[in-house]
From Swiss-Prot:
Official protein name in the record: Uroplakin-3b-like protein 2
Cytoplasmic side: 226-263
Lineage of the species this protein comes from: Eukaryota, Metazoa, Chordata, Craniata, Vertebrata
The encoding gene: UPK3BL2
Extracellular topological domain: 34-204
First and last residue of the signal peptide: 1-33
Organism, as annotated: Homo sapiens (Human)
Amino acid sequence: MDNSWRLGPAIGLSAGQSQLLVSLLLLLTRVQPGTDVAAPEHISYVPQLSNDTLAGRLTLSTFTLEQPLGQFSSHNISDLDTIWLVVALSNATQSFTAPRTNQDIPAPANFSQRGYYLTLRANRVLYQTRGQLHVLRVGNDTHCQPTKIGCNHPLPGPGPYRVKFLVMNDEGPVAETKWSSDTRLQQAQALRAVPGPQSPGTVVIIAILSILLAVLLTVLLAVLIYTCFNSCRSTSLSGPEEAGSVRRYTTHLAFSTPAEGAS
């Protein structure tokens, strides 16, 4: 620092001018060439996949990362700054441009055009050594709309993907980590028929099993029909009988006997 103050008198500048010169030099070291925006601070951290023993570490549409614990303790980063996870195709990392405003943040719906999007919004309080987050599962939200900024939508294909963390505030990017290595998701494999002709023994076994299955189905059908037939015959269709006795009457015909001596 003392050498910087000696630079002013050496080139004929006063103490105030020397201080201004040093401030300008420090500012220029943080400004990207061709822009008026300060370059984000580089954090020497590489995102890593979670432990191999974790179930679901890699699926058809998700992968799980370790927490970046204690990686955002720089004095340039505030607790109010937003920490995004940038998800990109491996061949799109070179063309990635950090958004300057929240309106420029790409959503998962823009992934097919840009090759990257931002998700898993957080802050450094959640990434302390004893943070609240345990794992970061990328692509785990099946209910959010892909047009929504920050949506953790399932990944559309096997990849390969690369990720990094990006810190932003209202003025633009503040800091960023390094890109991760390539991550490839699992792929669904179609069922394949057994190659080569089947042996005669296999054909005989398949035929016997088919015959036994047909016989079993026939027996079951016959038992079902017999049971249903007997059940229908034994079912009474009359109503409940009334209790009581019925007296039987015999009908007699009354004949009048002619009176004796009648003429």
